[in-house]
Amino acid sequence: MVEQIKDKLGRPIRDLRLSVTDRCNFRCDYCMPKEVFGDDFVFLPKNELLTFDEMARIAKVYAELGVKKIRITGGEPLMRRDLDVLIAKLNQIDGIEDIGLTTNGLLLKKHGQKLYDAGLRRINVSLDAIDDTLFQSINNRNIKATTILEQIDYATSIGLNVKVNVVIQKGINDDQIIPMLEYFKDKHIEIRFIEFMDVGNDNGWDFSKVVTKDEMLTMIEQHFEIDPVEPKYFGEVAKYYRHKDNGVQFGLITSVSQSFCSTCTRARLSSDGKFYGCLFATVDGFNVKAFIRSGVTDEELKEQFKALWQIRDDRYSDERTAQTVANRQRKKINMNYIGG
């Protein structure tokens, strides 16, 4: 039987973000800048990661508390060996209605079919430019946008439902909004543009680098005829629009200009096995990995997850100002540990 629990702000729990690795094969400046994550950077050893059995156990207990959706993140999740084994385990859990995965797309041809066969049906591909030269400068690994576009074509050809995520930074890739909308509109693929956020500690974020939803919308309306779309469910983070001529939808994620803390239903598990109630968390998360490995029962695990959710009062984006960002003393958890 599913228990209905809410946090201190009355928010239910519906989603679980599972980071399966802290490693990535890109070095995007806003997430894992090469100056910080160089060739000598020490990533987590395997024994510091949750095993797939541990993740499945955690997901099963969370399903009993109301979680219906699971998203697999990283780092780059396709760098975790035998990820299809985890997908198959998660697909067997009663109550889990949707399993998604966020990826940079580079390894889709290598692993996509195995993941599909294990039950994965939905992926988000992070792609911040459609121009090859610009994309190479963003990922710092000399990977062309055309390479990722080919991987996306492959993913759709095997039956995966693909959405594309684009983090927009002023003066960096805001000139990519129109060409990317045009390209994916013709492909009938949903694209979502995300306001640049101050996740982690190393991306040099400030308000001047943010292109807001309203600024994006003004740009888009000069080139396309669009209509707004009603939200599909409670807690949907994107504001959706529809192209009038072919009905293809796109989204704008207002993580800075119009925060959505009040409807956030996500629990997050970092790659080193810690619980976080917010993408912008500063306090060290509860060590779920150590708790599980101490020999607790599923009932004890459930009670701990309930307690963690019921004391949750995070609303970082609601409270974000230039002053709060400048005065912040404690470091946030880095994005490669907690996913997006």
From Swiss-Prot:
Gene3D superfamilies in the cross-refs: Aldolase class I
Record has Iron as a keyword: yes
Task: Report the outcome of R192A.
Answer: Reduces activity by about 80%
Q: Where does [4Fe-4S] cluster 1 bind?
A: C24, C28, C31
The note describing how and how many cofactors are bound reads:
Binds 2 [4Fe-4S] clusters. Binds 1 [4Fe-4S] cluster coordinated with 3 cysteines and an exchangeable S-adenosyl-L-methionine and 1 [4Fe-4S] cluster coordinated with 3 cysteines and the GTP-derived substrate.
Which residues are listed for GTP binding in this entry?
Answer: R17, R71, T102, K163, R266, A267, R268
Q: Name one GO biological process term.
A: Mo-molybdopterin cofactor biosynthetic process
What range does the record give for the signal peptide? none
Q: Relate the outcome reported for changing Y30A.
A: Reduces activity by over 80%
Q: Which Gene Ontology terms cover its molecular function?
A: 4 iron, 4 sulfur cluster binding; cyclic pyranopterin monophosphate synthase activity; GTP 3',8'-cyclase activity; GTP binding; metal ion binding; S-adenosyl-L-methionine binding
Report the EC code(s) recorded for this entry: 4.1.99.22
Residues annotated to bind S-adenosyl-L-methionine: Y30, G75, S126, M197
Which pathway, per its entry?
Answer: Cofactor biosynthesis; molybdopterin biosynthesis
Residue positions binding [4Fe-4S] cluster 2: C261, C264, C278
| UniProt entry tagged with the keyword GTP-binding | yes
CDD domains per UniProt: Radical_SAM (cd01335), Twitch_MoaA (cd21117)
Q: What is the effect of changing C28A?
A: Loss of activity
Annotated phenotype, changing R266A: Loss of activity. Strongly reduced affinity for GTP
Q: Give the family from UniProt.
A: Belongs to the radical SAM superfamily. MoaA family.
Main function: Catalyzes the cyclization of GTP to (8S)-3',8-cyclo-7,8-dihydroguanosine 5'-triphosphate.
Q: What is this protein called?
A: GTP 3',8-cyclase
